[in-house]
Amino acid sequence: MSLTPSLTRAEIEEFWETWLDINRQVEATGDWRPMAEWYAEDATYGWMYSPDEHFMAVGRDQIRDWAIGIEMDGLDGWHYDYQCTMIDDAKGMAVGFWKQKSGILDESGQEYEILGIGGSWFGFERQIGGADDGLIKIAWQRDWFDMPSTAHTFMAIVEAGKAPDTLLKRMSVGGLKVPGHYRYADIPSSVWPPPVEAGEHITQQKAPEATA
């Protein structure tokens, strides 16, 4: 979609509340695919597994089928509790910081949790033309999380004999053969959000070039 006039803070906050609500709904069912309707038809959604393995979904269909489909299948009972949200209405962005918890209790009665700070960075746009004309949608999303901590928590659940078959199946799915997984050189969209990568929001000029 074309770039649209800026959104008001009230509009972003209203949209954000619907986003938090659909998050809770899909966590309850274990099927995240309905969240796809919050994304623009041409949205991009990505994150990094390692320096040379990245995930990227381009378009609403890939987001539905891959990002919140294949990548989330088997995580029944997991929930992503937003701890803090920062909204920049001038740029049409929000950053949400979340804790990733499993819904599975350890021997002490504490819930297994992926430690470290996780979050999602969103860009919003009002759509022009098409079926979504006039609606606010997510134009791009980029996530980050602590991958070593993720692996540690998954293995702790397995070693305790508490991993359901659905989680074990999900853990068996990985690597570059999985749809949406790319080497860095092959990513179909930029690691940084497209408008940021294009330099549209520079807040500090580059440091002097290294000479050594």
Label for each model-derived stretch:
Residues 32-97:
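A solvent-exposed, acidic/Ser-Thr-rich amphipathic alpha-helical stretch
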Residues 19-21, 64, 123:
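Short, well-ordered amphipathic alpha-helices
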